[in-house]
Amino acid sequence: MEEIQRYLQLKRSQQHNFLYPLIFQEYIYAFAHDRIFSRSFLSENTGYENKSSLLIVKRLITRMYQQNPFIIFPNDSTQNQFLGHNKNFYSQLISEGFAFIVEIPFFLRLISSLEGKKKKIVKSQNLRSIHSIFPFLEDSFSHLNFVLDILIPQPVHAEILVQTLRYWVKDASSLHLIRFLLNEYCNWNSLIFPKKASSSFSNSKRNQRNQRLFLFLYNSHVCEYESIFFFLRNQSSHLRSTYSRVLLERIYFYGKIEHLVNVVVKVKDFQANLWLVKEPCMHYVRYQRKSLLASKGTSLFMNKWKCFLVTFWQWHFALWFHPRRIYINQLSKNLLEFLGYLSSVQMNPSVVRSQILENSFLINNAIKKFDTLVPIIPLIASLANTKFCNVLGHPISKPVWADLSDSHIIDRFGRICSNLSHYHSGSSKKKSLYRIKYILRLSCARTLARKHKSTVRAFLKRLGSELLEEFLMSEEDVLFLTFPKASSTLRGVYKSRIWYLDILCISDLVNYK
């Protein structure tokens, strides 16, 4: 990255389009593939298993210099050919390198904005964890009333992504290449948002290789969505956003806001009508396609926000945004499904005895508490889709794992069980997890019994039930094995919700949507 940064500093004053020449540099592909060219990705092309991957990259760069790079061979069985070989292979190769290249200006911008803040960066490493969101929700959402449950729409056409990226990357050649790569993948919509767990996105190696480029394009698209929140926050509050300068550094943005005043609000003075969406206590959270906008305001206020966002997105992105994609939920009455949890704000009653002189009386207080539960029904449905149980939740064997050794089978089931228990450690009611552990335990036993052509009862009787006890260990047991000197009085604390700061992604079983 330092070599690329020096290259950009030298070339920035010489030419404006500084991204496109990096595509012709071999070391870019080394960076993109962690300097390892011998991975299966670079050697899966038919007829080139024994060739050096570096030669493939050199041949690709040489042919990109030619005037007519799109060579079609009619005698080949593949209908679409690109650069003399399979079109998908070289498109994947270019997209991997280009995905690394197009992230460089954003990386340099981030580094420049964080200079002199290294101590803050070290302290904020734990914020990378998904579980770091929930302590924020506990502190903030318990005092709020309504929340907008927003499903961010995906763009209906690839050109929308290119136009969005045009405000970030001032490089016409790179934008043309992005447009070409998107046109190469006609089913790019399903690559970003798979509708089913068995879709090509989750199983196909080709789609996994291009995931980085597509996710980068989609994230730039989402940043465009979120820009309106930063703008309204800075206009309607004295508290300025510290990251808005980096996020909103795009051409024509404030020109769009001026048109937004005339088209959406239909008034001349935008500042005088910010009361429509002005709220000093608003919180915004997003993960993947789902975002939450919580407020202390009334239902009428949230309806104004809903109409404002729908109209803004439809006009700004020229696509149809259905109002039903935004749900208005009252936190005290509705369950909020977010990040594999069912969340709500519950009233926790408490009684306080007070005594003044000879008179004593009771004071009933109701304290709002942010509650998180495990969605047991969707989780069982996810286990049924992966063939650990049937649709009713009855455990079944896993035939595809029957050829593995006993230790590998137990290790796989134990890893799944511990990951689910680890992720759902923040649930206020742990009884739902016991059913999931029971399904996985019995599924493991039936898989082992199927392998040894025996019954579950006979297998457990012969080897002992302790064989499956290891991966059924609870989180609090793991903590007390790690800290054996912990007092027994703390066991009640550990039985409550635990948020871990080492969870960087959601398991496929949890991400059942």
From Swiss-Prot:
* Pfam families, per the entry: Intron_maturas2, MatK_N
* KW Acyltransferase (keyword) present: no
Single GO MF annotation:
RNA binding
Tell me a GO cellular component. chloroplast
GO biological process: one example: tRNA processing
State the InterPro entries in the record: Domain_X, Maturase_MatK, Maturase_MatK_N
Q: Could you tell me the keywords of this UniProt record?
A: Chloroplast, mRNA processing, Plastid, RNA-binding, tRNA processing
Give compartment(s): Plastid, Chloroplast
Record has Membrane as a keyword: no
HAMAP family linked: MatK
The record's family statement is: Belongs to the intron maturase 2 family. MatK subfamily.
PANTHER family in the cross-refs: MATURASE K
Chain's role: Usually encoded in the trnK tRNA gene intron. Probably assists in splicing its own and other chloroplast group II introns.
Q: What is this protein called?
A: Maturase K
